[in-house]
A protein has these predicted regions:
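Flexible, glycine-/charge-rich segments associated with ATP-binding catalytic modules
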Residues: 1-9
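Amphipathic alpha-helical interaction surfaces in cytosolic regulatory modules
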Residues: 10-43, 47-99
């Protein structure tokens, strides 16, 4: 079913309530790449049960999704669920840094 969203529970993928280092970020990133391979479905990242996140995790898990060489964010949109404002602020910062980093590289 092409219009069905893919939901990923972050806590299950990294097997922890603390999304805290780059290797856990890698795990989530790889999973996103895996589930979106060959389709154009939207991915929902559910942060339910995650107590802590840091930038190392977010850079690797989500920042790299803005690298057009490895991921097409226009084709596979990514939505975030169950994330409090503190974590969202960190995420926004991560995304704006990633967008800058990857767009600078292209030009």
């Amino acid at each position: 079913n092409a219009d069905k969203n893919i939901e990923l529970k972050v806590k299950e993928i990294i097997d922890s309530k603390i999304a805290f280092d780059d290797s856990n970020g890698d795990k989530l990133f790889k999973k996103i790449i895996e589930v979106t391979n060959g389709n154009s479905q939207t991915v929902i990242l559910d942060f339910d049960g995650i107590d802590l996140v840091n930038t190392a995790f977010l850079n690797n898990a989500i920042g790299r999704l803005f690298d057009k060489e490895v991921y097409n964010i226009e084709k596979n949109r990514v939505l975030i669920r169950n994330m409090d404002d503190t974590k969202k602020d960190l995420l926004k910062e991560t995304i704006s840094n990633a967008v800058k980093r990857y767009s600078d590289r292209v030009s």
